[in-house]
């Protein structure tokens, strides 16, 4: 709750990511194997409360309370999630490279992973002004953890099983703008 904007007097919040809304559409559903993979994208406003003080390099449009974000979501067979993970983060890298922006992909160590995440990486763009890379997106494989929490399963002759979910930030407007202007 410390990172989210709650609407007073309501049990409503402004979203920090569209991932929850998109995957939530499938809550408590049993899908057919033929429906997979389900690939979705969303362009939405995102709202974040930032906690704590940040350094001078995070002033301006780097860390803002409202921004636009393009996201990719995949619901897939468990055996396909690793391939989707690789494909998804590469889409973001290819987008930035097509704009002649130097980027790199960094795998997050397990100690830095948020709840439910099995694997995650950050996509970072080069900042000539700061002479260092900064985060412009991230990609995560939650394996079946999110599907278990939401009750999203796949129908099978051998019994129903949980699918895998993945998400990827393709473009966060303000950080992409910084990378574009500086490069």
Predicted regions and their residues:
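TRNA-recognition modules of translation machinery and tRNA-sensing kinases, especially anticodon-binding
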Residues: 1-183
